Amino acid sequence: MLSRKIAGAALIVAAMTGCAGAQNVKHGYFFAGGHYIDTKGGQIMAGQMYVESRIPANVTKPYPIVMIHGAAQTGTNFTGTPDGRKGWADYFAEQGYAVYVVDQPARGRSADAGNAGSITRFTANILERRFTATAKFKEWPQAALHTQFPGDGPNKGQRGDPVFDQFYASQVQLLRPNSVSEKLVRDAGAALLDRIGPAIILTHSQSGPFGWVIADERPKLVKGIVAAEPSGPPFRNAVFGTQPGRLWGVTETPMAYTPAVSNPKDIATVEESTADGPNLVKCMKQAEPARKLTNLQNLPVLVFSAEASYHAAYDHCTAKYLKQAGVKADFVRLEDAGIKGNGHMVMIEKNNLEIAAMINGWLDKNIR
């Protein structure tokens, strides 16, 4: 019985994502980047990135949107939802944007050459506790507010619920450490922009730093960044441990700073004396005078966090760091925009199009 429910949900997803705007939007795909490497059996390609395109017949926006998924995910995060609703890719194509949805190198349809890093996967238990059923586990204070993950019944957001099972079926491997993926996406993302021209980058979670490194690599071709709950906060982890992370501020790998930095230890830091509010972390920032992120100066950036996500405790720190480093960064808490109950997987939750509309409004005001 359960398998029939799962199969039914899969058919719904296929129907919804395959037909949305099909008469007005041209669908296609190509690969960006990549190079041949030697193996015992001969040469294979490594580092290439699958790119799926949705090009409206009438493109009305000046720049396309490139959507980059997070850890253990694929571009399906943006092409539909596990319960068969419209995804962000189709929504933004309907708004007049050309849309490009990627699978990160060594992920999904971007084949892993086996030469990059170690491979791991998220367990179902991790997803339940951190993404889909957080109100049941309450591992951080805001988790109790989570209401927007789709599904019905007592197992909503957990194994046995057909929507959760569809979501978990979509999970793939991820590379560790994150610095490996940063380097791969920096190169492939630059190759993508070299092909399509100037673009807006939309990131989520693990891919948050990928927006920063692509802009660092191709500053003239990145016209804006939307960072949905980007990996953070600066310099050290939060909520699930406080070990060092993102030693270059918002990335694991080198960024161009002014004055220049050759070793991340040269970036002098200081912790804020007080947090911005209850259940929020105290941010790490640069000691003044702060170095500037050379290639991100005045770049329009939107960072936003969801009300019930573990990111609610610290995403403001990422936005603060960017602003201190000369980036034109805005920070929005979804609940302050009247969008309540969301967890980390904002693009597939029940009100995903309400969130997309908020992003669309910001883009209309800030990207020229």
Can you name each region flagged by the protein language model?
Residues K61-G70:
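Short beta-strand element of the alpha/beta-hydrolase
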Residues L202-G211:
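Gly/Ala-rich beta-loop-alpha elbow adjacent to hydrolase catalytic centers
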